[in-house]
Amino acid sequence: MDIDVRGPRFGAAVTTLVLAVVLITGSAWLLAWQTLAFALGAAGGVGRSPYGWLFRTLVRPRLGRPTEFESPEPPRFAQAVGLAFAGVGLLGFTLGADWLGVAATGAALAAAFLNAAFGYCLGCEMYLLVRRLTVRAE
């Protein structure tokens, strides 16, 4: 079943805010929260993430009917990519390699911002590229 495109974009906006605060404060705890949010989105789809729940319960009822839908697989893959970057960032911050924490968190922030501000999902594009490459290889 396809999903409302506004949900992942809302999640990207919240993620952008959270990751910006992580970079400003260097908070490993807040990055751990974001890592968990990515993990839930990767495991169960964006609707199962905390931000998906917020969108579904607080935001979507106040919006009009969705006019655009997308397959859930690309955003789910994007959550897994975000999980990888957040996990590396979390390792960096907790092991004292702050440069690694900042670099990985900054990369995740850039991707989230692109989705939130412009509707361009880097992880989704990666998913489509991987699909094209694997279909050709078969």
Model features per residue range: what roles?
Residues 1-138:
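Membrane-interfacial helix-loop segments of redox and metal-homeostasis proteins
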